[in-house]
Amino acid sequence: MAHTARDKEKLLIRVRRIRGQVEAVERALKEEQECTDVLQLVAACRGALNGLMAELVEGHIRFHVLDPDRAKDSSQAAAAEELIDIVRSYLK
């Protein structure tokens, strides 16, 4: 995944944020916090993971499905953009 090397620091920042969120869930469970608080923390984790997934899928489509040397106005590029939008909305 050569494209991830270029965005590596941005992706690692996301992963570290997710790690912090998961650790917050663990602390909440250990401290026997209210169910609604734990559920909200888990929902935040899920949202963060979905955001990471969307970022990785978009990079994969742009660099492995699309031919980077091909004109940006091609029907393939338009279809790829449409797929990216659909995946992003699904993962929200």
Predicted feature locations:
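Solvent-exposed interaction patches of small proteins and small membrane subunits
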Residues: 1-92
